Amino acid sequence: WLKNHKEPLPSGVIAMSPWTDLTISGESVETNFEKDPLFGKTRDSMLYNKDYLGDNDPTNEYISPLFGDYEGFPPLLIQVGSYEMLLSDSTRVAKKAKEAGGKVKLSIYEGMFHVFQMAMLLMPESKKAWAEIKRFLHYLDTEENEMQNISKEEKA
């Protein structure tokens, strides 16, 4: 919306386990159905849910960002778990943004589930994800580092 209405864009975007395709067309919706402890149990409501969509087109870019234009998009950090039904949403948005010339860091956390980052101090993967977010914010603030350096862990 901001870009389409010529409003200033944020310096960067952090997307944690984003749901970017409400057409539910991603391969991982099926392949990760039994692995995803959060969305797996609600798959049918995802597939047939009209509460959110109403009569709106699920390919509308404001509803499903996957279908948006990523040219001129700010740097993007996407974090997603490998067990998420929404994994394909993240990989496809990352690909689309890169193809549009954007700076994108896609981090797939092995064995993790939807919004695993919210476990904060309970899991090492969550701690690692928050440290990556900190490095991304530093990158946005200084622009001294390359995007690929965001995943490098700090030395203790």
Tell me what each language-model feature is.
Residues 1-156:
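Alpha/beta-hydrolase superfamily serine-hydrolase fold, recognizing
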